[in-house]
Amino acid sequence: MFGSSSTGFSLKNFLTGALLLCSSSSVSAKSSNQWIDIWGCMPQLVEPGNLPPAPYNGGDAVFKNATLRQTVYITQDASIIRLSFSNAFGGSDLPITAATVALPASGTGAGSSAIKPGSTKTVTFSGGRPGFLVPNGALVVSDPIKIQVKAQSVLTVTLYFATGQTGQSITGHPGSRTTSWLAPGNLVSAADLSSSAAGVASTDHWYFLSSIEAYQPERASALYIVGDSITDGRGSTTNANNRWPDQLLARLQKAGRSLSSISIINQAAGGNRILADGLGPNALGRIERDVLARPGNGVRYALIFEGVNDIGTAPLDSVSQQSVGDRLISAYEQMITRLHSGGIAAFGATITPMSGPGQAYGEPEREKTRQRVNEWIRRSGRFDAVVDFDRAVRDQKNGTMLDKRWDSGDYLHLNPEGYRVMAEAVDLKIFERFAEGVEVYL
């Protein structure tokens, strides 16, 4: 019988213990902290020309018996992080054998092959396992790692693949504007890959690493930017982190207050389109993966800055251009609706100039479409706020062209100073206005 004093078993004590256990679990579940992204990139299928250099792209496998060292630019201070690795586009399982994180060596930064002595932390998975076999199409998250990182600083992530990934279909982000290092053998803890072994190579791409999350206070939040090569940093300086989102981050950090607790997550890729797959999945489809499905309650803001590649690759005739303009506007409406359903403020950015000698995107019919779409972005009232990049960087005498001071040379992408002007065009008050996100719209 329950409650017998002779056995020492008490129903009352049993229930009290059970309630305490449940209470403890509930307190943990309701912690005021959250996991939130502090770095990210848009995973995509790596094109043949962007695979790692020989001998790391052999016919049967990529990265076979190879160490890969990559650096990323952190956007928020943190002391506990975890890493996500994507095999979304892999044609086979991705066998991660070992991994570490570290700080770059003193006096170095983005693109460095060297790490700071004593800063290395071993990365584990699923409760302490040293590696993970990531199924094709899947994503894996590491165990939490205690390491102090600062906003606008660099973190080094090193991976070792004993057998490599079979085939030539792998996941990565070619437009890293950051140098990565490769070496034969397991060198995840090596002080400097460039002097560790023969056969060391470098490439300006990222592979497999898709996000870094941090365990942050509830006040922390994030801006996700859905964009194309202009946001991905074409025309910026390799290893300098001077894309326009990087320079916007500098403004937020300098502003302090609540603004310094906003991460910026660059979910852009060169050649990306809203209405059709190209270099990476179309933005209308990937907004679920790249924004809505991201962790934490801090996903407060999203900025949509795409459309130039849809206009520029659509046929030149007026009927086709009328159609692509109409479809872009409808797609913006869909993206806004879906962001609002998640309580996320939806910001829109006007499409920047794309005309110039020999620039096919700047044909008159395409320019008409750009102007029409921009007027809708500015005047429809559908976006919660508008960032007028077009007005900020266009030539004051010929609004169809970039100001020559900001042009990287192709009449489409900007140089680092132009990206500074874009970053300055963002009114920081919009982040305070929508600090709690938005109400869920009917």
Write out the residue ranges for each language-model feature.
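Structural recognition of the beta-strand scaffold that forms the well-ordered cores
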Residues: 82, 222-227, 231, 262-268, ...
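Catalytic His-Asp segment of secreted/periplasmic serine-dependent ester chemistry enzymes
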Residues: 312, 352-442
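N-terminal secretory targeting modules
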Residues: 27-226, 236-238, 257, 434-442
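Oxyanion-hole/transition-state-stabilizing segment in secreted/luminal serine hydrolases
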Residues: 269-327
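Fungal secretory targeting signals
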Residues: 1-30
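Extended, charge-rich intrinsically disordered regulatory tails
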Residues: 305-307, 315, 342, 347, ...
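Short connector loops at secondary-structure junctions
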Residues: 257-275
